[in-house]
Amino acid sequence: MKRLHLAGIIPVANLKSDFQIPTPEILLPVSRDLTAIQKSVFECAMAGCNTIWIVANDDIAPIVRSTIGEWVYDPVYYRRPTRHSSEERREIPIYYVPIHPKDRARRDSYGWSILFGIHSAWYAGCLSRSLGRQHFLLEAKAGF
């Protein structure tokens, strides 16, 4: 039986809005301690995504990366009633993908950033399946 891998795609590249503010719109607060991008990542985690892909160009990616980070805890395993719940927590990795430079001037839309995020997640999955597990194992020689 095949296991389903659910990838959450959050497109923030080429996001256009009606707000006239100098900061990116994804950093606007939606509640007391939560910004819009943090809420999107939390909703992907609550939906059961195994990976989260944020499509952000190079101008906004460092801001998003400093706000979100590289991973988020899976909310299902965060507060399990076990003796050592901190050891059973699972992390959901967050990947940052920029739009390809040849597509930035021609295919510069919100919909294209969604499609590019889907394609990047699919391509990474195909690449990891074709390489197999043996290519990622490193063996240390005795004495090191």
Indicate where each model-derived feature is located.
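N-terminal glycine-rich phosphate-binding loop and ensuing alpha1 helix
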Residues: 1-84
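Conserved beta-loop-beta/alpha segment of the NTase-like Rossmann-fold superfamily
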Residues: 65, 74, 83-144
